[in-house]
C-alpha cells in the first residue's frame, strides 16, 4: 500500500519537481528549431526517439495562445493538413504534451490541443496532461483557457462528456454533407455527421459550454450555396 502524504508535503514535492524541470536530465525532449514571425513562433521539438513534433505560440498583447500536439503524425488524414501526410507514428506521453508548454518559457493564457495529431485518439494521455495543467500545484491553468479541437470520434466524445473537466470544445466539421466530409476527412467516414453533432451538443448541454464548429472553405468541395443552406 502506498503512503498517503499531506497537503504540505505534496506542495513541497511539486515545487521541487518544477524547480528541476528546466534541467535536461529531467526532460524527454528538446527545442530543435524556432521559426518566428511578427505574431507567431513555431517550435520544432526533438523527442528522445528522434521523432519530431511542432508547437505553435500565437502572441497576444497580454500573453499568448499555444497550439499543442498530441501525436507524432496523424491517423485522420484531412486533405488540407500536412500532419498526416506520412501517416501516424505514435501517441505522445502526457509528459511530452505538458513539456511543450513548459519549454516555451512564455506567458500562456490559452491552450488549444490542435497541433499534430487527433487529440481524442490519444485520450488517456490527453486527459492526464489536462489534469496536470489544471492542478493547483502544477501549472494551475484555468479550465476556461483550455480547448480541445477534434474531428469528433463519437466514442471518445461520449467519454469526454462524462469527465469532470468542463473544458472548451471545437469540432472540426468542415462539411454539411456526409459525402463532402468523407472526401475532406477520409478516415472519419465511419462516423455520421449527425452523430458527431449530436454528441457535441450533448457535451454542451451537460457542461454548459458553447461548441465551436470549425468549417474550412475548400473551393469546389464544400463552398456551394447548398452547403451554406
Where does each model-flagged region fall?
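Short linear Ser/Thr-Pro motifs
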Residues: 28, 34-38, 69-70, 83, ...
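Short, small-residue-rich loop/turn micro-motifs
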Residues: 47, 72-74, 173-175
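Cys/His-clustered metal-coordination modules, chiefly Zn-binding fingers
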Residues: 99
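Canonical Radical SAM [4Fe-4S] cluster-binding loop centered on the CxxxCxxC motif
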Residues: 59-95, 103
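Short aromatic/hydrophobic contact patches that present stacked aromatics
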Residues: 42, 65-69, 147, 214
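Flexible, acidic/Gly-rich N-terminal and inter-domain linker regions that tether
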Residues: 1-64
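Conserved AdoMet/S-adenosylmethionine-binding subsite of the radical SAM
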Residues: 106-110, 115-229
